[in-house]
Every structure is written in structure tokens, then in C-alpha cells.
Amino acid sequence: MKGRRPSHRRQLIPPLLTGLRVKVLAHSDPSLEGLEGWVVVEEARSLRILTLEGRVSTVLKDLAVIEVEAPGGEYIRISGRVLIGNPLDRVKEYRWRVSRRCRSSSRLKT
């Protein structure tokens, strides 16, 4: 993740972070800054990250700024406060937004 800049265009937050590679850019606990690895568990208020050394660390979402490697290869910088809440609710909202866009674009074609 070193040396890559996040894209500045409007991005959707990935609906689930589990399995994605992340890096903690800022945190109120200085020992967690720079932590890099893969999200193994996403809970309502925390992330459990499997580090490159093989340890599992818990990071509180509301106190962190993280960078996520999205499936398309882009890097997205996210404030943890945006991620607070049940991840499954975020999936439902994401599906609703995508399906709504598809419906509105199909109306424009006719």
C-alpha cells in the first residue's frame, strides 16, 4: 500500500470490509497507526485485522482513519465514524442504492 494515492473521485464505501486489505492511517492509539493487514472480522464498532506478522489486532472504528484496497484495485480513505453500525445494514443500503440506480437508468432509456 506504500506509495499509492487514493482516487479522488466519488466512491462508494465497500459494503463489507471482511477479506479486504486495510491500513490504519491515523488512530487515537499511536501503537495502531501504520497497522496493515486483512480484515478477518467486522463488528458494529470494531475491526479485527490479521497483520502481516500473523497477529490479530482489534481496531475501534470511531477512533480510526483507514485506507482500504477495494476489489477494483483502488485505494479508498475512510473515516471510521462512517463505518460505525452493523455491516449487514450497510450491505442492505448498498443493494438498495445500486438497484435504485439501475431502475432510474432504465427509465431514461425508454
Curated annotation (Swiss-Prot):
Keyword Acyltransferase belongs to the record: no
Source species of the chain: Aeropyrum pernix (strain ATCC 700893 / DSM 11879 / JCM 9820 / NBRC 100138 / K1)
GO annotation, biological process: tRNA 5'-leader removal
Key words of the record: Cytoplasm, Endonuclease, Hydrolase, Nuclease, tRNA processing
Family annotation (Pfam families): RNase_P-MRP_p29 (PF01868)
Entry GO MF terms: ribonuclease P activity; RNA binding
Source domain of life: Archaea
Function noted in UniProt: Part of ribonuclease P, a protein complex that generates mature tRNA molecules by cleaving their 5'-ends.
Gene name of the encoded protein: rnp1
Family per similarity comment: Belongs to the eukaryotic/archaeal RNase P protein component 1 family.
Annotated catalysed reactions: Endonucleolytic cleavage of RNA, removing 5'-extranucleotides from tRNA precursor
Oligomer status and interactors: Consists of a catalytic RNA component and at least 4-5 protein subunits.
Enzyme Commission number(s): 3.1.26.5
GO cellular component terms, A-Z: cytoplasm; ribonuclease P complex
SUPFAM superfamilies in UniProt: Rof/RNase P subunit-like (SSF101744)
Gene3D superfamilies for this protein: Ribonuclease P/MRP, subunit p29
Name listed for the protein in its UniProt record: Ribonuclease P protein component 1
Intracellular or extracellular location(s): Cytoplasm
Entry keyword annotation includes rRNA processing: no
